[in-house]
Amino acid sequence: MRVKMFKPLRLVLLIAVSVLLMAARMPNMRVVPWQQVEVPTQNILLDIAFTGTTPSHGWLVGDKATLLESRDGGLHWQVRELPGLEPEAYLASISFAGAEGWVAGQPKILLHTLNEGSDWTSIRLNNQLPGEPLLIQALGPGAAEMVTNVGAIYRTEDGGQTWHAQVDEPIGAIKNIARGPEGEYLAVSSRGSFYFLYTPESRTWKPYPRESSRRIQNMGFGPHGSAWKLNQGAEIAFTDDFTSGQWSSPLRPGRALSFGYLNAAYQNDHDLWVVGGGATLIHSPDGGKTWEQAKKLSNIPANFYSIEFFGPEQGFILGQRGTLLRYVSSNNS
């Protein structure tokens, strides 16, 4: 029996099949400029930073009180243990401005250094602090901004002795947050149904519902006022103006993966890298128009949780089981 399809339906199916075929043919990178680095831990790595005074002096933080130090730009790492830090401490974020650095984590953890980490002191946080520290940003001598996992934002100008609220009301549980170049924030609600935008002049969070049927996983800022958004199901969307609330139709680069995308970062104005579960790493050389995959890394038994660039030639990928990858080009190999 022949089945005659309605033409619009036939067109939709044709487009769907074409998209799947194109996805299946995502080219593989001929040269993968990433090198796995051995680190002395099997714990989850959560954040990385380098000091502003010695660019080769870096620090890694993670769960289970993980604190690692490098003196050679991230090639080799050594464990640093701090007295008084509980074994189950969750060190979520680290940031430096010059020689001054900060580490924020849970439960109610805030560490401070004035000498590139040679000495760390613990700063007591008020038990009434809404939520737990999720992100810390060093801003200059004595100054830093801290965000909790319910969207409370606080700033200090005196080395952490006093903190001043920067937002009138928190927003409830969030799972991911990113800070923009001028102090803006994009935060994703814990269930991924909403995202929120904060700008310093507003003192409030503005909510936006998800536009896709898939929940939001993560968000971040791009060059020149742009932003990216990762949805569950390996979707990516873009906007040229992160304050507009208007996004492109979601893309699904690559074949239909069982692993989702978890984080992304721009290397420069046009090179975009996306990481995800199952050692997923894809790259776009043109801001999201075309894509290629780093299939060579798929044998690494870890999820890639985050990626960060400190300049076009210095980048790192962090993941579970102590997984660390370093960007390697002809200039820093």
Curated annotation (Swiss-Prot):
One of the protein's GO biological processes: photosynthesis
Keyword Signal: yes
InterPro entries: PSII_CF48-like_dom, WD40/YVTN_repeat-like_dom_sf, Ycf48/Hcf136
Signal peptide residues on this chain, from the entry's feature table: 1-25
Annotated GO CC locations: photosystem II; plasma membrane-derived thylakoid lumen
The UniProt record lists the keyword Secreted: no
Predominant location: other
Pfam families: PSII_BNR
HAMAP family documented for this protein: Ycf48
The protein's role, per its UniProt record: A factor required for optimal assembly of photosystem II (PSII), acting in the early stages of PSII assembly. Also plays a role in replacement of photodamaged D1 (psbA). Assists YidC in synthesis of chlorophyll-binding proteins.
Oligomeric form and interacting partners: Part of early PSII assembly complexes which includes D1 (psbA) and PsbI; not found in mature PSII. Binds to the lumenal side of PSII complexes. Interacts with YidC.
Domain notes: A 7-bladed beta-propeller torus, about 55 by 55 Angstroms, with a depth of about 25 Angstroms and a central pore.
NCBIfam families: PRK13684.1 (NF010237)
Name the record gives this protein: Photosystem II assembly protein Ycf48
Taxonomic lineage of the native organism: Bacteria, Bacillati, Cyanobacteriota, Cyanophyceae, Synechococcales
Gene name of this polypeptide: ycf48
